[in-house]
């Protein structure tokens, strides 16, 4: 029994053989079934350290309760900025920086902070400008060659299916012109995915998170790691069914983004595996073991 995602990397020629052992799932349904809808919507976010606001938002929508998008939006802004300001700089050997002032308000000021001005039309001059997040992106661009640590997956079309799908911030903004430029040069690797966080943050600085209820009892909610799906049913004032599929479920699916990305990382760059994993961002603890050549 383990609450951590186990990852074993072993060199096989120029590439890495990857073995994933998913963590034991938390028995969410067993903990919540038989409780009133309002109580379930309050308890669900408390069961998880990450994306709690998005999960609570999804539960309220699926159960037909009043729902407010502002906490989920703030959560996305905070988590994206933590990557850009604190976590990725450390992994890349750069100095961390404080989150921008008044970040929770979003708006044009946050967009300006990202780019050091207006959002650029051409990605490559921006990378050498030294403005906004350009130094971080430029360093990341030097770390990975085109085609390294890439994963090309079908778009998210069936959020409740436990299959490999592109459920990520980058997938959410894949049609943005900057994203197309990055994909054409690097493929769907760490640079593309990190840029996706930035473009996603630019969008959410002004707009509330997208949420949908395709049918009664099913909610799809934007979260920091992608789209969170939750299905629930209540009868006689009690929740009688509940299931959830997270971006991490799609990430860890057979032939999903995590396995494909690590398998296409050169063995000589195994030291960058921690950065690749953090950019993919599973919402569980991770234990990585690197084995030597046989």
From Swiss-Prot:
Belongs to the HupK family. This is Hydrogenase expression/formation protein HupK. It comes from the Bacteria. SUPFAM superfamilies: HydB/Nqo4-like. InterPro entries: NiFe-Hase_large (IPR029014).
